[in-house]
């Protein structure tokens, strides 16, 4: 195995291993996008609740 990463060998569309690596990279990137979107929405929801009074926040969180 060489010391440096060879992109063309790792993601070669002619080999089964290369195709598997492409599939794994695709699923990993989709998972990453999903997590980032979930985190962003969660932070947005928290920011919106800070605009209201504490009683309103509790009603929104429990309601």
UniProtKB/Swiss-Prot annotation:
InterPro entries: ATPMK (IPR009125). Disulfide bonds: none annotated. It comes from the Eukaryota. It is found in: Mitochondrion membrane. GO terms for cellular component: mitochondrial inner membrane; proton-transporting ATP synthase complex. It is a single-pass membrane protein. One of its GO terms (biological process) is proton motive force-driven ATP synthesis. Its main location: mitochondrion. Coiled coil: none annotated. The keyword Transmembrane applies. Keywords: Membrane, Mitochondrion, Transmembrane, Transmembrane helix. The chain crosses the membrane at residues 15-37. Pfam families: ATP_synth_reg. Mitochondrial membrane ATP synthase (F(1)F(0) ATP synthase or Complex V) produces ATP from ADP in the presence of a proton gradient across the membrane which is generated by electron transport complexes of the respiratory chain. F-type ATPases consist of two structural domains, F(1) - containing the extramembraneous catalytic core and F(0) - containing the membrane proton channel, linked together by a central stalk and a peripheral stalk. During catalysis, ATP synthesis in the catalytic domain of F(1) is coupled via a rotary mechanism of the central stalk subunits to proton translocation. PANTHER family: ATP SYNTHASE MEMBRANE SUBUNIT DAPIT, MITOCHONDRIAL, ATP SYNTHASE MEMBRANE SUBUNIT K, MITOCHONDRIAL. F-type ATPases have 2 components, CF(1) - the catalytic core - and CF(0) - the membrane proton channel. CF(1) has five subunits: alpha(3), beta(3), gamma(1), delta(1), epsilon(1). CF(0) has three main subunits: a, b and c. The ATP synthase complex/complex V exists as a monomeric and a dimeric supercomplex that helps shape mitochondrial cristae to optimize proton flow. This is ATP synthase membrane subunit K, mitochondrial. It comes from Drosophila melanogaster. The lineage of its organism: Eukaryota, Metazoa, Ecdysozoa, Arthropoda, Hexapoda.
């Amino acid at each position: 195995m060489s010391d440096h990463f060879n992109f063309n060998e790792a993601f070669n569309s002619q080999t089964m291993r290369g195709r598997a690596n492409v599939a794994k990279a695709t699923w990993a990137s989709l998972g990453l996008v999903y997590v980032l979107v979930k985190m962003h929405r969660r932070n947005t929801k928290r920011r919106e609740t800070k605009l209201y009074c504490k009683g309103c926040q509790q009603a929104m969180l429990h309601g």
